């Protein structure tokens, strides 16, 4: 009996002396399900978790909610309201990355950039240094779905990856319409192969979509309001200057400067090929219903097209609707021989005034 008591006491001492499991090992042992309430905690420990819940996180000023090291196959869920401290810096405020990642949100959640603190009407062209919102970079076979994002300081999503799906995303920067919001692009896509954006609902002050380079890109079922329209370009003077196999379809552009557009940089080299705009409805477009021009320089048109970025195998099919009284339904400004193999049908845009400045319109198209 005395021996048994001593044995039990010894066992108890050993148990007491054993080190407590680390926070990381606890997460792994519990099936890798983690709820975080701070950005630092999430960024440091996300790689240990298969299911990540971000609950009412207030990201400190000048810091990134960095989820780029999430483990393969992880699911990231935003709950409540995610906010960010104020600082003049380049950002991003959030970073995603990884393989087979799913990013989603709980019902009623919102990611609020509180952009009015930075808005000054200048965007990225001066004034306050403004952080970009969300980098979705180095994503492979991943999905971002159902997010509600509002009040971005400047550009919202920067997308670089392969086989990336962005589904049913709401971007509401409408507060910036009368408060100095500028350069609030919804989706900037570059250096990607396979990006599929479906069901986006966007209110902003710049491009709803801007494709700067990449291939096999689809943008379908979108509603774009208040910005600059659905764009390819400007193409040229980047590390990658090729855009091919793009489909934009079944979408509506409302109260925007432009409906659909392709713009290439004057004097640059590159290519745009295999682009289809199909079944696009335009409403109250302020400047150009359809605009395709090869004359951009220093952020604006020059009126003098160049031929270094040819636009070939373009299909414009079923683009209909209206432009404002002072707008132009269609504007085409191509270099000599640098726009070819176009298919143009079912284009019917009412209102505005026909342009007399179109140049080198390819066979089959009309201006």
UniProtKB/Swiss-Prot annotation:
Temperature behavior of the protein's activity: Optimum temperature is 55 degrees Celsius.
EC number in record: 3.2.1.15
Active-site positions on this chain: 206, 228
UniProt propeptide residues: 18-30
GO biological process, one term: cell wall organization
Glycosylation sites: 279
pH dependence comment: Optimum pH is 5.0: Stable between pH 3.0 and 7.0.
Swiss-Prot/TrEMBL catalytic activity: (1,4-alpha-D-galacturonosyl)n+m + H2O = (1,4-alpha-D-galacturonosyl)n + (1,4-alpha-D-galacturonosyl)m
Record InterPro entries: Glyco_hydro_28, Glycosyl_hydrlase_28, PbH1, Pectin_lyas_fold, Pectin_lyase_fold/virulence
Keyword presence, Transport: no
Residues in the signal sequence: 1-17
Keywords of this entry: Cell wall biogenesis/degradation, Disulfide bond, Glycoprotein, Glycosidase, Hydrolase, Repeat, Secreted, Signal, Zymogen
Reported function: Involved in maceration and soft-rotting of plant tissue. Hydrolyzes the 1,4-alpha glycosidic bonds of de-esterified pectate in the smooth region of the plant cell wall.
Family membership noted in the UniProt record: Belongs to the glycosyl hydrolase 28 family.
Protein name: Endopolygalacturonase I
UniProt organism field: Aspergillus oryzae (strain ATCC 42149 / RIB 40) (Yellow koji mold)
Gene responsible for this protein: pgaI
């Amino acid at each position: 009996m005395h021996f048994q008591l001593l044995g039990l006491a010894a066992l108890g001492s050993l148990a007491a002396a054993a080190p407590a499991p680390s926070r990381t090992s606890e997460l792994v042992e519990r099936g890798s399900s983690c709820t975080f309430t701070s950005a630092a905690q999430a960024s440091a420990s996300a790689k240990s978790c298969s299911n990540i819940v971000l609950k009412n996180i207030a990201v400190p000023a000048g810091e990134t909610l960095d989820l780029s090291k999430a483990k393969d196959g992880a699911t990231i869920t935003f709950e409540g309201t995610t906010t960010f401290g104020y600082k003049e810096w380049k950002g991003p405020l959030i970073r995603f990355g990884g393989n087979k990642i799913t990013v989603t949100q709980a019902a009623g959640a919102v990611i609020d950039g509180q952009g009015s603190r930075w808005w000054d009407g200048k965007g990225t062209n001066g004034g306050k240094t403004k952080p970009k919102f969300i980098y979705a970079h180095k994503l492979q076979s991943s999905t971002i779905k159902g997010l509600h994002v509002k009040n971005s300081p400047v550009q919202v999503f920067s997308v670089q990856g392969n086989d990336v799906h962005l589904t049913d995303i709401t971007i509401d920067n409408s507060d910036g319409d009368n408060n100095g919001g500028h350069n609030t692009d919804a989706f900037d896509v570059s250096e990607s192969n396979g990006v599929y954006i479906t069901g986006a609902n966007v209110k902003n002050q710049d491009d709803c979509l801007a494709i700067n380079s990449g291939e096999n890109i689809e943008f379908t079922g979108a509603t774009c309001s208040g910005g600059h329209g659905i764009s390819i370009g400007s193409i040229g003077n980047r590390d990658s200057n090729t855009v091919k196999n793009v489909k934009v379809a079944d979408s509506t552009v409302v109260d925007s400067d432009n409906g659909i557009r392709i713009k290439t940089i004057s004097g640059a080299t590159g290519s745009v090929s295999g682009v289809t705009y199909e079944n696009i409805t335009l409403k109250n477009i302020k400047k150009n219903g359809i605009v395709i021009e090869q004359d951009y320089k220093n952020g604006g048109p020059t009126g003098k097209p160049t031929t270094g970025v040819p636009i070939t195998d373009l299909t414009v099919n079923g683009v209909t609707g209206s432009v404002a009284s002072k707008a132009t339904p269609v504007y085409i400004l191509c270099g000599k021989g640098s726009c070819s193999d176009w298919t143009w049908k079912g284009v019917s845009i009412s209102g505005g005034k026909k342009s007399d400045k179109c140049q080198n319109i390819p066979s089959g198209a009309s201006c």
